[in-house]
């Protein structure tokens, strides 16, 4: 998942809370669960949160690529499966499902549920939505998440027809899915935003269907009530939702306040019920006091903050020059001085929850080696001086501080001046996609707990570095067909080694989220992959 992770926002870092081992990360649920423990108040419950990235890039689930966009879609839509209030994967629109003995066929049986216009949600809606994501005309950056479907990649590459794709509604209530290869994590994928249904009538009736309340047809806990662009997005509880009794909030408002100090000030005044990650930000200078007050909560997240090199532009079309700039970065200095409480320096692409090489790949802040690599790279490139270099990042306090420190580290290591450019999030993302950058701030937080999800970022539509390596691509394809867990791990380890040797991205740190909430807020689910879900949230003031 892009978390501009990965990408549109910055997770605040606290004491390193790396997950133990490589098991499935657990979600966090705020406060005690309500349910039978509390009598439901008759007064309407509302919640005010902040979306500090500003305007979501889209609220179309088939096009969503970042946490803000996906969080909005998660409030408005429901998939076949969903995390419950305890963070457990449970049936949602699917009442039940079966998996064949060979792990290749999933059969989902749908319950009675409705769209906001009253039409029934059918298996045909899911078939249409999934094939729409894969359709090359849609140009979905997340189409690769559907490559696990039989002929999914072939259809996306115009080498197969839509009817060849392994998803078929055999009737209104039955969806049969056939995979290319067994994928034990497929149920996790099915719960992700990309796999949400969309209503064909709404999508094809208006190209701008996902921009106005009157055309935004949804099937989830909330329905879009109002969208004041660059100000706020307002949701109200959906009366047509199949599980509406579990939804306690009457309204949910996502404000768009980009300044972290303003966000915290509004929280302290009671104008916000939640401040900080995953959707907002907390001012770094306030973290000590918030921690000491006991109000702040923290949760490790399966994500990596990195810089992307544009490998089509000089000088970063040269591998050794990329290695030089990566090696010169002192990540420990950033952890100790830029972001408090010793965040974990990232010496590899994969976060600790998925690490294949726990010791990492990069010797942190090795200036002498960096100088040697730079000299060798410049000689190979036939240049005597470096062209102008710019670090581009989306606006946030943390992003700015990190860029300033790395700018200084490269100045001291190489005697060069690096320009810093901050941009509104949507502009930054589009410039990255179009290749209008030299070095760009980015990140990734897993969509599911498997190394392949991180490694696949460096191929296909999300690969903003434009780096290509045939051996790497072949290894990823080989891993998809390998049924032996140990052998598959070794294949992915080789693939990661290639990425770290070629260095299309410069890893900087591993994410930890931090937030504060009003005492009345309960049952907000923050999963270990960086998503927030308000379906079960309550706010009895």
Language model features with spans:
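N-terminal lobe/hinge region of extracytoplasmic solute-binding protein
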Residues: 50-101, 217
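Aromatic- and charge-enriched surface segment that lines or borders ligand/interaction sites
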Residues: 95-142, 176, 315
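Alpha-helical secondary-structure segments
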Residues: 123-129, 172-178, 182, 220-221, ...
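Surface-exposed binding/hinge segments that line
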Residues: 127, 143-200
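Gly/Pro-rich hinge or "lid" segments in bacterial periplasmic/extracellular proteins
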Residues: 179-247, 251
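Ligand-site clamp/hinge motif
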Residues: 207-210, 240-285
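Structural transition elements
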Residues: 344-377, 396-401
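Extracytoplasmic/peripheral linker and loop segments enriched in polar/acidic and small residues
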Residues: 417-428, 456-520, 540-541
């Amino acid at each position: 998942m892009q978390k501009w992770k990965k990408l549109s926002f910055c997770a605040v870092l606290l004491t390193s809370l790396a997950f133990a081992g490589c098991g499935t990360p657990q979600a966090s649920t705020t406060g005690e669960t309500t349910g039978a423990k509390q009598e439901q108040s008759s007064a309407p419950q509302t919640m005010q949160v902040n979306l500090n990235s500003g305007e979501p890039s889209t609220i179309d689930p088939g096009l969503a690529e970042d946490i803000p966009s996906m969080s909005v879609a998660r409030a408005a839509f429901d998939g076949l499966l969903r995390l419950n209030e305890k963070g457990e994967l449970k049936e949602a629109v699917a009442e039940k499902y079966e998996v064949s003995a060979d792990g290749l066929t999933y059969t989902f049986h749908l319950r009675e549920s409705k769209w906001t216009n009253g039409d029934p949600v059918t298996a045909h809606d899911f078939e249409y939505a999934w094939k729409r994501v894969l359709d090359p005309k849609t140009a979905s950056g997340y189409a690769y998440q559907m490559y696990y479907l039989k002929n999914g990649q072939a259809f996306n590459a115009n080498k197969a027809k839509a009817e060849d794709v392994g998803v078929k509604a055999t009737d209104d209530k039955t969806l049969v899915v056939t995979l290319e290869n067994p994928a034990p994590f497929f149920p996790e994928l099915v719960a992700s935003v990309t796999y949400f249904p969309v209503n064909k009538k709404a999508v094809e009736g208006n190209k701008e269907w996902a921009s106005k309340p009157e055309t935004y047809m949804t099937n989830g806990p909330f329905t879009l009530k109002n969208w004041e662009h660059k100000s706020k997005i307002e949701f109200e509880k959906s009366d047509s939702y199949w599980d509406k009794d579990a939804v306690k909030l009457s309204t949910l408002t996502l404000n768009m306040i980009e300044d972290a100090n303003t966000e915290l000030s509004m929280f302290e005044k009671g104008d916000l019920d939640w401040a900080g990650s995953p959707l907002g930000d907390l001012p770094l200078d306030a973290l000590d006091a918030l921690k000491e007050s006991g109000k702040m909560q923290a949760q490790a997240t399966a994500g990596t903050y990195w810089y992307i090199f544009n490998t089509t532009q000089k000088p970063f079309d040269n591998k050794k020059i990329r290695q030089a700039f990566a090696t010169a970065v002192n990540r420990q200095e950033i952890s100790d001085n830029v972001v408090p409480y010793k965040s974990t320096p990232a010496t590899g692409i994969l976060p600790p929850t998925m690490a294949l090489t726990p010791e990492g790949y990069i010797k942190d802040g090795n200036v002498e080696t960096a100088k040697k690599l730079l000299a060798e790279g410049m000689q190979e490139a036939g240049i005597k001086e470096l062209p102008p270099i710019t670090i581009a990042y989306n606006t946030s306090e943390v992003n700015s501080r990190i860029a300033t420190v790395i700018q200084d580290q490269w100045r001291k290591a190489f005697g060069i001046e690096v320009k810093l450019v901050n941009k509104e999030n949507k502009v930054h993302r589009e410039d990255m996609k179009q290749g209008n950058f030299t070095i760009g701030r980015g990140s990734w937080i897993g969509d599911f707990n498997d190394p392949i999800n991180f490694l696949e970022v460096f191929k296909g539509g999300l690969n903003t570095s434009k780096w290509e390596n045939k051996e790497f691509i072949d290894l990823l394809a080989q891993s998809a067909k390998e049924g032996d867990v140990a052998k598959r791990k070794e294949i992915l380890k080789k693939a990661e080694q290639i990425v770290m040797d070629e260095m299309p991205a410069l890893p900087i740190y591993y994410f930890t989220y931090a937030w504060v909430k009003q005492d009345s807020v309960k049952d907000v689910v923050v999963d270990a992959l960086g998503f927030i879900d308000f379906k079960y949230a309550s706010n009895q003031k």
